[in-house]
Amino acid sequence: KGSVLNLFAYTGGASLAAKAANMDVVHVDSIKQVVSWANENQAHSKLKGIRWVVEDALKFVSREVKRGKKYQGIILDPPAYGIGAKGERWKLEQKLGTLLEQVAQILSPKGFLVLNVYSLGLSPYIIQNLMKDYFGDRDFEISELCLNSRTNQILPLGIVARI
């Protein structure tokens, strides 16, 4: 058993999966209505005990760094662009490096990380370089997310990085 931090957690699918695996879960999203929806999903799933946090993810992680908190797993599904609850502007290309630098400080040495990226401004090579910069010699993998179309074209959707 360990703890999982789900950032940009939206309606909580990953939070529920982690809780069902008997993990302590912290679910962070900046939109109160979305966190309420996730809490309803927890009730429908007959699970209990997820910690709900309505806050800017970067601010939350920054405080966790100061507290010396460590997580066994961190899940990140940041939007390409967004506006936080207090009007904070989020642009993935500008903030991802800072976010990963701080996340690296709260991920336990043998912990796992899943990062989903949906931005045309970031390539798999950029994500690979960021992972090397902030997670050093830890083993990780990068994959592209895509769909096959009815016309036999591959449609790019995003990138996933996993430790």
Regions found by a protein language model. Name each.
Residues 2-10:
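Conserved class I S-adenosyl-L-methionine
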